[in-house]
Amino acid sequence: MDAQKMKMVIGLVLVATTAFALMIPAASAVDDFITRRAYDNLVKSGAIKDIPVMAKTIISNPVLEEGMLTYYTNKKLGDSAISCGETCFKFKCYTPRCSCSYPVCK
């Protein structure tokens, strides 16, 4: 195999490896979200300052919010009501008076 073809093969392998490596985190990511109502409660209570970096996705569309809450209710917790409107990805709830019942705060 000449040098030009060898460089092309190595380049293709590097591109494929990089593309695969970039897809793994996206495929294994867990959505960590908070509803607009829960976020507003955090701001009003002053507890927002206790969160070092807001890494949650704020859901402000009522239809999308209801869909996410329904998904988590049906998939993980049966027919439980979700009162806090926040997921607890790292087993911590920021909304006051809520505790983690993975994957959502109650």
Curated annotation (Swiss-Prot):
Keyword Signal annotated: yes
Sorted UniProt keywords: Cytolysis, Disulfide bond, Hemolysis, Knottin, Plant defense, Signal
PTM entry text: Violacin-A is not a cyclic peptide.
Signal peptide span: 1-29
Description of its domains: The presence of a 'disulfide through disulfide knot' structurally defines this protein as a knottin.
The organism of origin for this protein: Viola odorata
GO biological process, one term: killing of cells of another organism
Source domain of life: Eukaryota
Disulphide linkage map: C84-C98, C88-C100, C93-C105
Function of the molecule: Probably participates in a plant defense mechanism. Has low hemolytic activity.
Protein name, entry field: Violacin-A
Residues excised as propeptide: 30-79
Keyword Signal on entry: yes
Lineage, uppermost ranks: Eukaryota, Viridiplantae, Streptophyta, Embryophyta, Tracheophyta
Entry's family note: Belongs to the cyclotide family. Moebius subfamily.
Pfam family, one: Cyclotide
Other comment: The presence of a premature stop codon inhibits the translation of a key Asn residue that is thought to be required for cyclization.
